[in-house]
Amino acid sequence: MRVRSEALAMFSALGFARTLIRPVGAPSPGGRRNRFDEIYQSFARLRALHTFIQPPLRTIDQTDMTDLLAATLEHLETLVSFDTRNPPRAIAAEGGIFDYLRAQLPGFQVEVIDHGDGAVSLYAVRGTPKYLFNVHLDTVPDSPHWSADPHVMRRTGDRVIGLGVCDIKGAAAALVAAANAGDGDAAFLFSSDEEANDPRCIAAFLARGLPYDAVLVAEPTMGEAVLAHRGISSVLMRFAGRAGHASGKQDPAASALHQAMRWGGKALDHVDSLAHARFGGLTGLRFNIGRVDGGIKANMIAPAAELRFGFRPLPSMDVDGLLATFAGFADPAAAHFEETFRGPSLPSGDIARAEERRLAARDVADALDLPIGNAVDFWTEASLFSAGGYTALVYGPGDIAQAHTADEFVTLVQLQRYAESVNRIINGSH
Protein backbone atom coordinates (compact mmCIF):
# COMPACT_ATOMS: atom_id res chain seq x y z
CA MET A 1 0.00 0.00 0.00
CA ARG A 2 2.96 2.33 0.64
CA VAL A 3 4.06 1.87 -2.99
CA ARG A 4 0.58 2.74 -4.19
CA SER A 5 0.49 5.90 -2.02
CA GLU A 6 3.88 7.04 -3.31
CA ALA A 7 2.79 6.40 -6.89
CA LEU A 8 -0.32 8.50 -6.40
CA ALA A 9 1.73 11.28 -4.83
CA MET A 10 4.05 11.24 -7.87
CA PHE A 11 0.96 11.35 -10.12
CA SER A 12 -0.21 14.55 -8.40
CA ALA A 13 3.26 16.10 -8.64
CA LEU A 14 3.50 15.28 -12.35
CA GLY A 15 0.11 16.84 -12.94
CA PHE A 16 1.24 20.09 -11.33
CA ALA A 17 4.60 20.07 -13.16
CA ARG A 18 2.75 19.45 -16.39
CA THR A 19 0.80 22.69 -15.98
CA LEU A 20 4.02 24.62 -15.23
CA ILE A 21 6.01 23.31 -18.19
CA ARG A 22 3.26 23.74 -20.75
CA PRO A 23 0.37 26.20 -20.22
CA VAL A 24 -2.93 24.48 -19.64
CA GLY A 25 -4.80 23.78 -22.85
CA ALA A 26 -1.88 24.79 -25.10
CA PRO A 27 -0.53 22.33 -27.69
CA SER A 28 3.12 21.36 -27.73
CA PRO A 29 5.29 23.20 -30.28
CA GLY A 30 4.85 21.82 -33.77
CA GLY A 31 1.96 19.67 -32.59
CA ARG A 32 4.39 17.16 -31.03
CA ARG A 33 3.25 15.42 -27.89
CA ASN A 34 4.94 16.80 -24.78
CA ARG A 35 7.08 14.13 -23.07
CA PHE A 36 5.47 15.06 -19.75
CA ASP A 37 2.10 14.18 -21.27
CA GLU A 38 3.31 10.64 -21.96
CA ILE A 39 4.63 10.20 -18.42
CA TYR A 40 1.50 11.77 -16.94
CA GLN A 41 -0.80 9.50 -18.92
CA SER A 42 1.18 6.44 -17.81
CA PHE A 43 0.67 7.38 -14.19
CA ALA A 44 -2.98 8.16 -14.93
CA ARG A 45 -3.45 4.57 -16.06
CA LEU A 46 -1.78 3.33 -12.89
CA ARG A 47 -3.99 5.57 -10.80
CA ALA A 48 -7.10 4.25 -12.50
CA LEU A 49 -6.12 0.78 -11.34
CA HIS A 50 -5.54 1.69 -7.70
CA THR A 51 -9.07 0.94 -6.57
CA PHE A 52 -8.63 -2.65 -7.74
CA ILE A 53 -5.53 -3.24 -5.63
CA GLN A 54 -6.98 -1.85 -2.42
CA PRO A 55 -8.06 -4.33 0.24
CA PRO A 56 -11.77 -5.08 -0.08
CA LEU A 57 -14.01 -3.01 2.16
CA ARG A 58 -15.02 -4.88 5.29
CA THR A 59 -18.69 -4.90 6.10
CA ILE A 60 -19.73 -4.14 9.65
CA ASP A 61 -22.13 -6.26 11.65
CA GLN A 62 -23.53 -5.85 15.15
CA THR A 63 -20.75 -7.90 16.75
CA ASP A 64 -17.84 -5.74 15.57
CA MET A 65 -19.51 -2.31 15.63
CA THR A 66 -17.35 0.13 17.59
CA ASP A 67 -18.72 2.24 20.43
CA LEU A 68 -17.99 5.31 18.33
CA LEU A 69 -20.04 4.05 15.39
CA ALA A 70 -22.85 2.94 17.69
CA ALA A 71 -22.98 6.43 19.20
CA THR A 72 -22.87 7.98 15.73
CA LEU A 73 -25.84 5.89 14.60
CA GLU A 74 -27.79 6.76 17.73
CA HIS A 75 -27.30 10.48 17.13
CA LEU A 76 -27.98 10.09 13.42
CA GLU A 77 -31.30 8.36 14.05
CA THR A 78 -32.40 11.32 16.16
CA LEU A 79 -31.09 13.94 13.72
CA VAL A 80 -32.96 12.30 10.84
CA SER A 81 -36.18 12.40 12.85
CA PHE A 82 -36.12 16.20 12.83
CA ASP A 83 -37.78 17.71 9.77
CA THR A 84 -35.21 20.14 8.34
CA ARG A 85 -36.38 20.14 4.74
CA ASN A 86 -35.41 23.29 2.88
CA PRO A 87 -37.53 24.73 1.35
CA PRO A 88 -39.88 25.68 3.02
CA ARG A 89 -37.25 27.50 5.14
CA ALA A 90 -39.20 26.87 8.34
CA ILE A 91 -36.39 25.64 10.62
CA ALA A 92 -36.60 27.22 14.08
CA ALA A 93 -33.83 28.18 16.49
CA GLU A 94 -35.77 27.00 19.55
CA GLY A 95 -36.88 23.42 19.99
CA GLY A 96 -36.12 20.66 17.55
CA ILE A 97 -32.70 19.88 16.19
CA PHE A 98 -30.80 22.80 17.71
CA ASP A 99 -32.03 22.07 21.23
CA TYR A 100 -30.95 18.47 20.74
CA LEU A 101 -27.45 19.43 19.61
CA ARG A 102 -27.01 21.89 22.46
CA ALA A 103 -27.95 19.16 24.95
CA GLN A 104 -25.45 16.75 23.38
CA LEU A 105 -22.48 19.11 23.72
CA PRO A 106 -21.77 19.42 27.46
CA GLY A 107 -18.62 21.35 28.20
CA PHE A 108 -18.98 23.48 25.07
CA GLN A 109 -19.75 27.16 24.92
CA VAL A 110 -22.79 27.13 22.64
CA GLU A 111 -24.30 30.04 20.74
CA VAL A 112 -27.47 29.71 18.66
CA ILE A 113 -28.41 32.58 16.33
CA ASP A 114 -31.55 32.95 14.24
CA HIS A 115 -30.66 34.80 11.03
CA GLY A 116 -34.24 34.75 9.70
CA ASP A 117 -36.04 32.77 6.98
CA GLY A 118 -35.08 29.42 8.47
CA ALA A 119 -31.37 30.26 8.64
CA VAL A 120 -30.10 29.22 12.07
CA SER A 121 -26.53 28.65 13.18
CA LEU A 122 -25.11 26.87 16.21
CA TYR A 123 -21.52 27.71 17.06
CA ALA A 124 -19.98 25.48 19.72
CA VAL A 125 -16.44 25.74 21.11
CA ARG A 126 -14.48 23.74 23.68
CA GLY A 127 -10.95 24.78 24.55
CA THR A 128 -8.78 26.52 21.94
CA PRO A 129 -9.11 24.46 18.76
CA LYS A 130 -7.09 25.06 15.60
CA TYR A 131 -9.74 23.73 13.22
CA LEU A 132 -13.42 24.49 12.66
CA PHE A 133 -15.83 21.79 11.47
CA ASN A 134 -18.82 23.05 9.49
CA VAL A 135 -21.92 20.96 8.73
CA HIS A 136 -25.29 21.99 7.32
CA LEU A 137 -28.33 20.37 8.91
CA ASP A 138 -30.96 21.22 6.31
CA THR A 139 -31.96 18.72 3.65
CA VAL A 140 -33.68 18.88 0.31
CA PRO A 141 -37.41 18.04 0.26
CA ASP A 142 -38.27 14.37 -0.04
CA SER A 143 -39.94 12.95 -3.15
CA PRO A 144 -42.89 10.56 -3.60
CA HIS A 145 -40.40 7.88 -4.62
CA TRP A 146 -39.25 7.13 -1.08
CA SER A 147 -40.15 3.56 -0.13
CA ALA A 148 -40.71 4.42 3.55
CA ASP A 149 -40.93 7.40 5.90
CA PRO A 150 -37.81 9.49 5.09
CA HIS A 151 -37.62 10.78 8.68
CA VAL A 152 -37.36 7.29 10.19
CA MET A 153 -33.82 5.99 9.78
CA ARG A 154 -33.59 2.30 8.97
CA ARG A 155 -30.66 -0.05 8.64
CA THR A 156 -30.35 -2.49 5.75
CA GLY A 157 -27.24 -4.63 5.59
CA ASP A 158 -24.16 -2.43 5.28
CA ARG A 159 -25.96 0.93 5.23
CA VAL A 160 -28.48 3.21 6.88
CA ILE A 161 -31.25 4.93 4.95
CA GLY A 162 -32.98 8.21 5.74
CA LEU A 163 -33.37 11.79 4.54
CA GLY A 164 -30.07 13.57 5.10
CA VAL A 165 -28.00 10.58 6.25
CA CYS A 166 -25.61 11.16 3.35
CA ASP A 167 -26.10 14.90 2.84
CA ILE A 168 -24.94 15.46 5.50
CA LYS A 169 -26.40 14.63 8.90
CA GLY A 170 -24.13 11.60 9.11
CA ALA A 171 -21.17 13.94 9.56
CA ALA A 172 -23.00 15.95 12.22
CA ALA A 173 -23.76 12.76 14.15
CA ALA A 174 -20.14 11.61 13.95
CA LEU A 175 -18.86 14.97 15.21
CA VAL A 176 -21.17 14.85 18.22
CA ALA A 177 -20.12 11.27 18.94
CA ALA A 178 -16.43 12.21 18.67
CA ALA A 179 -16.92 15.24 20.91
CA ASN A 180 -18.34 12.99 23.61
CA ALA A 181 -15.62 10.36 23.19
CA GLY A 182 -13.01 12.65 24.77
CA ASP A 183 -12.35 16.16 26.01
CA GLY A 184 -10.15 17.52 23.23
CA ASP A 185 -10.41 21.03 21.84
CA ALA A 186 -13.13 21.33 19.21
CA ALA A 187 -15.19 23.89 17.31
CA PHE A 188 -18.36 23.24 15.34
CA LEU A 189 -20.52 25.47 13.17
CA PHE A 190 -23.87 23.87 12.35
CA SER A 191 -26.07 25.74 9.87
CA SER A 192 -29.51 25.31 8.31
CA ASP A 193 -29.54 27.34 5.10
CA GLU A 194 -27.15 25.60 2.68
CA GLU A 195 -29.91 24.09 0.55
CA ALA A 196 -31.59 27.51 0.24
CA ASN A 197 -28.69 29.08 -1.69
CA ASP A 198 -28.85 31.96 0.78
CA PRO A 199 -25.82 31.50 3.03
CA ARG A 200 -26.70 33.83 5.89
CA CYS A 201 -25.14 31.60 8.53
CA ILE A 202 -21.72 31.53 6.88
CA ALA A 203 -21.83 35.25 6.09
CA ALA A 204 -22.56 36.08 9.72
CA PHE A 205 -19.73 33.84 10.90
CA LEU A 206 -17.25 35.32 8.44
CA ALA A 207 -18.10 38.82 9.63
CA ARG A 208 -16.74 37.92 13.07
CA GLY A 209 -13.23 37.17 11.80
CA LEU A 210 -12.58 34.36 14.28
CA PRO A 211 -9.10 32.82 13.92
CA TYR A 212 -8.80 29.20 12.73
CA ASP A 213 -5.96 27.48 10.93
CA ALA A 214 -8.45 25.80 8.60
CA VAL A 215 -12.13 25.00 8.10
CA LEU A 216 -13.25 21.44 7.29
CA VAL A 217 -16.62 21.59 5.56
CA ALA A 218 -18.60 18.35 5.61
CA GLU A 219 -20.13 17.18 2.34
CA PRO A 220 -20.20 13.67 0.84
CA THR A 221 -16.65 13.12 -0.47
CA MET A 222 -16.23 9.39 0.27
CA GLY A 223 -13.95 10.19 3.17
CA GLU A 224 -11.41 12.07 1.07
CA ALA A 225 -10.24 15.66 1.43
CA VAL A 226 -11.34 17.67 -1.59
CA LEU A 227 -9.21 20.75 -2.21
CA ALA A 228 -10.88 22.24 -5.29
CA HIS A 229 -14.29 22.48 -6.88
CA ARG A 230 -16.19 24.60 -9.35
CA GLY A 231 -18.05 27.77 -8.59
CA ILE A 232 -21.65 28.33 -9.58
CA SER A 233 -23.65 31.16 -11.12
CA SER A 234 -27.38 31.24 -11.87
CA VAL A 235 -28.89 33.80 -14.24
CA LEU A 236 -32.37 34.99 -15.21
CA MET A 237 -32.85 36.53 -18.67
CA ARG A 238 -35.94 38.12 -20.19
CA PHE A 239 -36.41 38.87 -23.89
CA ALA A 240 -38.94 41.31 -25.34
CA GLY A 241 -40.53 40.93 -28.78
CA ARG A 242 -43.62 42.21 -30.61
CA ALA A 243 -46.81 40.18 -30.78
CA GLY A 244 -48.22 39.48 -34.21
CA HIS A 245 -49.50 36.89 -36.65
CA ALA A 246 -46.88 34.31 -37.59
CA SER A 247 -47.88 34.22 -41.28
CA GLY A 248 -46.05 37.41 -42.20
CA LYS A 249 -42.35 38.00 -42.76
CA GLN A 250 -40.75 38.59 -39.38
CA ASP A 251 -38.11 40.99 -38.25
CA PRO A 252 -35.33 38.88 -36.64
CA ALA A 253 -36.03 40.53 -33.30
CA ALA A 254 -39.82 40.26 -33.46
CA SER A 255 -40.07 36.96 -31.62
CA ALA A 256 -38.78 36.92 -28.06
CA LEU A 257 -38.47 33.15 -28.26
CA HIS A 258 -36.36 33.35 -31.41
CA GLN A 259 -34.09 35.81 -29.63
CA ALA A 260 -33.71 33.36 -26.77
CA MET A 261 -32.89 30.47 -29.12
CA ARG A 262 -30.30 32.48 -31.04
CA TRP A 263 -28.76 33.52 -27.75
CA GLY A 264 -28.64 29.87 -26.67
CA GLY A 265 -26.78 28.84 -29.82
CA LYS A 266 -24.12 31.49 -29.30
CA ALA A 267 -23.78 30.63 -25.63
CA LEU A 268 -23.34 26.91 -26.33
CA ASP A 269 -20.72 27.63 -29.01
CA HIS A 270 -18.79 29.74 -26.51
CA VAL A 271 -18.93 26.97 -23.92
CA ASP A 272 -17.52 24.55 -26.50
CA SER A 273 -14.61 26.93 -27.10
CA LEU A 274 -13.61 26.61 -23.43
CA ALA A 275 -13.50 22.81 -23.43
CA HIS A 276 -9.71 22.69 -22.97
CA ALA A 277 -9.50 25.06 -20.00
CA ARG A 278 -8.19 23.20 -16.97
CA PHE A 279 -7.61 23.55 -13.24
CA GLY A 280 -6.67 20.86 -10.72
CA GLY A 281 -8.07 17.96 -12.72
CA LEU A 282 -11.23 19.79 -13.80
CA THR A 283 -11.73 20.73 -17.44
CA GLY A 284 -14.05 23.04 -19.33
CA LEU A 285 -17.07 25.07 -18.28
CA ARG A 286 -20.21 23.32 -17.07
CA PHE A 287 -23.24 25.08 -18.57
CA ASN A 288 -26.96 24.39 -18.60
CA ILE A 289 -30.02 26.17 -19.98
CA GLY A 290 -32.46 24.92 -17.40
CA ARG A 291 -35.74 26.54 -18.40
CA VAL A 292 -37.28 28.56 -21.22
CA ASP A 293 -40.80 30.00 -20.96
CA GLY A 294 -42.69 32.15 -23.42
CA GLY A 295 -45.05 32.36 -26.34
CA ILE A 296 -48.75 31.70 -26.65
CA LYS A 297 -49.40 29.39 -29.62
CA ALA A 298 -47.81 28.25 -32.87
CA ASN A 299 -49.30 30.96 -35.10
CA MET A 300 -48.53 33.89 -32.79
CA ILE A 301 -45.20 35.70 -32.55
CA ALA A 302 -43.98 35.48 -28.96
CA PRO A 303 -43.98 38.93 -27.33
CA ALA A 304 -41.99 37.82 -24.27
CA ALA A 305 -39.71 35.00 -23.17
CA GLU A 306 -37.88 34.11 -19.99
CA LEU A 307 -34.77 31.96 -19.82
CA ARG A 308 -32.86 30.60 -16.84
CA PHE A 309 -29.36 29.25 -17.17
CA GLY A 310 -26.48 28.35 -14.93
CA PHE A 311 -22.79 27.67 -15.29
CA ARG A 312 -20.08 26.20 -13.11
CA PRO A 313 -16.69 27.81 -13.72
CA LEU A 314 -13.23 26.54 -12.92
CA PRO A 315 -11.45 28.28 -10.03
CA SER A 316 -9.25 29.98 -12.63
CA MET A 317 -12.15 31.51 -14.60
CA ASP A 318 -13.33 35.13 -14.35
CA VAL A 319 -17.04 34.92 -13.48
CA ASP A 320 -17.73 38.61 -14.17
CA GLY A 321 -16.08 38.25 -17.55
CA LEU A 322 -18.18 35.20 -18.36
CA LEU A 323 -21.36 37.02 -17.36
CA ALA A 324 -20.46 39.97 -19.57
CA THR A 325 -19.78 37.63 -22.48
CA PHE A 326 -23.08 35.79 -22.07
CA ALA A 327 -25.00 39.06 -21.76
CA GLY A 328 -23.34 40.32 -24.94
CA PHE A 329 -24.67 37.41 -26.98
CA ALA A 330 -28.21 38.81 -26.78
CA ASP A 331 -29.11 40.69 -29.97
CA PRO A 332 -30.87 42.97 -29.39
CA ALA A 333 -29.80 43.36 -25.79
CA ALA A 334 -31.88 41.31 -23.39
CA ALA A 335 -34.65 43.20 -21.67
CA HIS A 336 -33.38 41.81 -18.38
CA PHE A 337 -30.15 40.03 -17.36
CA GLU A 338 -29.79 39.23 -13.66
CA GLU A 339 -27.42 36.98 -11.78
CA THR A 340 -29.65 35.42 -9.12
CA PHE A 341 -26.99 33.44 -7.23
CA ARG A 342 -23.23 33.16 -7.16
CA GLY A 343 -21.04 30.77 -5.26
CA PRO A 344 -17.28 31.16 -5.67
CA SER A 345 -14.98 28.35 -6.68
CA LEU A 346 -12.75 26.52 -4.23
CA PRO A 347 -10.15 27.79 -3.74
CA SER A 348 -11.01 31.41 -4.41
CA GLY A 349 -8.85 34.05 -6.05
CA ASP A 350 -6.97 34.44 -9.32
CA ILE A 351 -4.92 31.54 -10.69
CA ALA A 352 -1.83 32.23 -8.58
CA ARG A 353 -3.78 32.90 -5.38
CA ALA A 354 -6.08 29.92 -5.93
CA GLU A 355 -3.11 27.58 -6.36
CA GLU A 356 -1.48 28.99 -3.23
CA ARG A 357 -4.65 28.30 -1.25
CA ARG A 358 -5.00 24.81 -2.73
CA LEU A 359 -1.48 23.95 -1.60
CA ALA A 360 -2.23 25.32 1.88
CA ALA A 361 -5.30 23.08 2.08
CA ARG A 362 -3.21 20.13 0.92
CA ASP A 363 -0.76 20.79 3.75
CA VAL A 364 -3.64 20.73 6.25
CA ALA A 365 -4.93 17.44 4.84
CA ASP A 366 -1.44 15.94 5.05
CA ALA A 367 -0.98 17.17 8.61
CA LEU A 368 -4.28 15.55 9.61
CA ASP A 369 -3.50 12.31 7.73
CA LEU A 370 -6.55 12.71 5.49
CA PRO A 371 -6.50 11.00 2.09
CA ILE A 372 -6.69 13.56 -0.71
CA GLY A 373 -9.31 13.11 -3.40
CA ASN A 374 -9.85 14.59 -6.83
CA ALA A 375 -11.40 17.98 -7.48
CA VAL A 376 -15.18 17.79 -7.86
CA ASP A 377 -17.81 19.46 -10.02
CA PHE A 378 -20.38 20.15 -7.30
CA TRP A 379 -20.39 23.35 -5.25
CA THR A 380 -19.97 23.64 -1.49
CA GLU A 381 -19.86 26.38 1.12
CA ALA A 382 -16.16 25.66 1.63
CA SER A 383 -15.65 28.20 -1.14
CA LEU A 384 -17.29 30.87 1.02
CA PHE A 385 -14.77 30.24 3.79
CA SER A 386 -11.96 30.36 1.22
CA ALA A 387 -13.23 33.67 -0.14
CA GLY A 388 -13.39 34.90 3.47
CA GLY A 389 -9.68 34.25 3.93
CA TYR A 390 -9.67 30.81 5.55
CA THR A 391 -7.83 27.74 4.36
CA ALA A 392 -10.73 25.43 3.56
CA LEU A 393 -11.29 21.90 2.34
CA VAL A 394 -14.28 19.57 1.93
CA TYR A 395 -14.29 16.33 3.88
CA GLY A 396 -17.16 14.04 4.78
CA PRO A 397 -18.65 10.55 4.62
CA GLY A 398 -20.85 9.25 1.84
CA ASP A 399 -21.12 9.42 -1.93
CA ILE A 400 -22.48 12.56 -3.61
CA ALA A 401 -24.34 10.25 -6.00
CA GLN A 402 -26.68 9.38 -3.12
CA ALA A 403 -27.39 12.99 -2.15
CA HIS A 404 -30.84 14.32 -3.06
CA THR A 405 -32.10 10.85 -4.04
CA ALA A 406 -35.03 8.77 -2.84
CA ASP A 407 -33.96 6.24 -0.19
CA GLU A 408 -30.74 8.20 0.36
CA PHE A 409 -28.14 6.11 2.18
CA VAL A 410 -24.66 6.12 3.65
CA THR A 411 -22.62 3.01 4.38
CA LEU A 412 -21.55 2.04 7.88
CA VAL A 413 -17.94 1.81 6.72
CA GLN A 414 -18.04 5.43 5.55
CA LEU A 415 -19.57 6.61 8.82
CA GLN A 416 -17.07 4.67 10.92
CA ARG A 417 -14.05 5.92 8.98
CA TYR A 418 -15.21 9.52 9.23
CA ALA A 419 -16.07 9.21 12.92
CA GLU A 420 -12.66 7.68 13.66
CA SER A 421 -10.83 10.40 11.74
CA VAL A 422 -12.60 13.32 13.43
CA ASN A 423 -12.19 11.62 16.80
CA ARG A 424 -8.47 11.42 16.12
CA ILE A 425 -8.35 15.09 15.11
CA ILE A 426 -10.34 16.25 18.14
CA ASN A 427 -9.07 13.91 20.84
CA GLY A 428 -5.79 12.68 19.38
CA SER A 429 -2.50 14.31 18.55
CA HIS A 430 -3.70 17.03 16.15
Language-model-detected regions and their locations in the chain:
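Low-acidity, Ser/Thr- and Arg-rich intrinsically disordered low-complexity segments
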Residues: R2-S5, S12, R47
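Glycine-biased, low-complexity coil/linker segments
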Residues: M1-V3, G30-R32
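Active-site metal-coordination/substrate-binding segment of hydrolases
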Residues: L132-F190
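Metal-dependent amide/peptide-bond hydrolase catalytic core
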Residues: D67, D114-H115, P141, S233-H430
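N-terminal polybasic/positive-inside topogenic patches
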Residues: R22, S28-G31, A44-R58
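Aromatic (phenylalanine/tyrosine) cluster motif
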Residues: F11, F16, F36, Y40-F43, ...
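Acidic/histidine-rich catalytic neighborhood of metal-dependent amide-processing enzymes
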Residues: G164, I168-S234, F279
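N-terminal helical capping/dimerization or prosegment-like subdomains
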Residues: D64-S143, A304-R308, L322-T325, L412-Q414, ...
